[in-house]
């Protein structure tokens, strides 16, 4: 996977340490964690990254043991930090300056609501319509939490000088996220010292529907929606142009950076199978 790209993302990177197995025909309650040799697997990923000059990002969201993050940090694997989840102890959004450097930061992902969808509670409405809430009272609690989080986000933008008090008051009363606030959110996150920032087109275009809704199969059109603009139309789209200029000022390309020389050597595909075989 590293052969022709500059970066790879390891989904559920905790699987390098353990994976929850459920035997066929059994329930999740009957499953168990199967553990792997974390240091040995990281010791395979790291040299391959150097050899192919490919950055590695580990998707370390959810319940992740500290030892996994420590091992990945020692190997130079970037953490995966999302604005929605990065909070202070009291629930406020973590300021950009407090984000870690060895990480990729983003507002959201394909498995979470888009910025516009999060703002209007589109994800909560959808989960309610598909009966995905195990407890009916959970919807009410999450609606209350979401209302508080919208205010927390606006106040975070105001503290960074990206919105003034009048703009905060106006945005707080709007059901639909305006383009000015969308740009402010991305510029706020761009101030983080994190090495990489990722931007979703769905967030820039303020689309309410997320690409994938976990917990569904044929109940929801996962991975089947197209963006409303062609690449040519996107190039002249005002919101995208303004955001690109703003991000370019905050996170400019490194001066003097030269194109990476990709690895030209032929790498045999079964190498790692041999390395992990006890008789090798």
Can you annotate each of these PLM segments?
Residues 1-270, 278-280:
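Catalytic cores of glycan-processing enzymes that make or break glycosidic bonds
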